[in-house]
């Protein structure tokens, strides 16, 4: 994009940014660095301030992917970590539904030095003019504002306005309680992680998976590698995910992040009860105890059986065909 090259910064053994590797590639041609914190392994980037200082030292900007903001809400902020711009995933932190491709919404926020570069027009407060005083609830009114260095409108320039309003209502309703929600999301993830290991040990199947990251405490999500199960029993992460559908669960994300072989990613969120987490852990182990041939056929009880996902991805059918086509 715009003639820039994307450079991937490797991780250390603990799953976090390799600061020395970052230093080795940074020069005055760097435009920005994009980071998710906590990262997709569920680990907080402890050296994020150092990374920000390195990028800023050459005039670059820091961009925050808000995908995992639910883990730190009320505890810290992208600004404190040194980020200059951020997009918030409203479907992951602020109550928006996210199924079937939408309605996703990712509002972008920037620090003051970038405000005049935002796409426009944007809504901004301005003094009241004329009869507007009859409708105003304070001494200001809202109007359109075109930032001085804006490129103007871009596609979907105001995004999904309904999602934004719902987010605002959610934020206003819970206020400081959002911090508690974040803490419960982290607590639930760590509780489930340890519950899975406990149930696996009790059932004698602890040799079927390992942690995706070497850490004592994760944030709002964690990963497991089913590589041992695949090597010993021919059971893949996809098989286990399909088996969980038969148990009545929405399956965890599989094969992401890519750095974890046969990866399953668990993000229980703050809304699940302890009883639900305990039952899920038991049912997960129940799936692991099934024979490989049974799991290869899963799901069995759902209205739609296992689909050929590779074929579906390569042969898109975006609408139902009419009879005369």
Provide a role label for each language-model segment.
Residues 79, 85-227:
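Active-site C-terminal subdomain of aminotransferase-like
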Residues 206-247, 258, 262-279:
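Conserved PLP-binding catalytic core of the aspartate aminotransferase-like
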Residues 1-141, 149, 235, 261-262:
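Conserved PLP-enzyme active-site core in the AAT-like
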Residues 1-13, 21, 29, 235-244, ...:
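Non-catalytic terminal/interface segments that mediate subunit docking, oligomerization
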Residues 24, 46-57, 187, 191, ...:
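Alpha-helical scaffolding segments of alpha/beta enzyme cores, especially the outer helices
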Residues 198, 248-251:
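Hard-cation-handling environments
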Residues 13, 39, 173-177, 228-230, ...:
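A generic structural motif
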Residues 258-325:
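PLP-dependent enzyme catalytic core of the Aspartate aminotransferase-like
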């Amino acid at each position: 994009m715009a003639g820039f090259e994307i450079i991937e910064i490797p991780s250390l053994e603990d799953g976090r940014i390799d600061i020395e590797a970052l230093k080795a590639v940074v020069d005055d041609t760097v435009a920005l660095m994009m980071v998710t914190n906590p990262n997709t392994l569920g680990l907080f980037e402890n050296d994020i301030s150092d990374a920000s200082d390195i990028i800023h030292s050459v005039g670059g900007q820091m961009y925050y992917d808000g995908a995992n903001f639910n883990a730190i809400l009320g505890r810290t902020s992208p600004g404190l970590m040194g980020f200059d711009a951020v997009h918030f995933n409203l479907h992951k932190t602020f109550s928006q539904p996210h199924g079937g491709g939408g309605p996703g919404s990712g509002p972008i926020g920037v620090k003051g030095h970038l405000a005049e570069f935002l796409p426009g027009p944007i809504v901004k407060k301005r003094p009241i003019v004329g009869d507007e005083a009859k409708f105003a609830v304070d001494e200001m009114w809202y109007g359109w504002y075109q930032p001085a260095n804006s490129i103007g409108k871009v596609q979907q320039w105001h995004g999904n306005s309904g999602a934004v309003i719902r987010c605002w209502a959610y934020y206003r309703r819970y206020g400081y309680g959002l911090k508690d929600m974040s803490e419960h999301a982290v607590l639930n993830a760590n509780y489930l992680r340890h519950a899975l290991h406990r149930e696996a040990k009790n059932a004698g199947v602890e040799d079927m998976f390992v942690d995706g990251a070497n850490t004592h405490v994760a944030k709002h999500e964690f990963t497991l590698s089913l590589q041992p199960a695949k090597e010993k029993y021919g059971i893949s992460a996809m098989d286990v995910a399909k088996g969980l559908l038969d148990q009545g669960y929405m399956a965890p994300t599989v094969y992401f992040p890519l750095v974890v072989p046969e990866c399953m990613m668990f993000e229980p969120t703050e809304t699940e009860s302890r009883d639900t987490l305990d039952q899920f852990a038991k049912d997960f182990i129940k799936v692991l105890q099934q024979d490989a041939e049974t799991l290869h056929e899963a799901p069995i009880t759902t209205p739609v059986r296992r689909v050929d996902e590779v074929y579906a991805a390569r042969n898109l059918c975006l609408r139902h065909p009419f009879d005369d086509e």
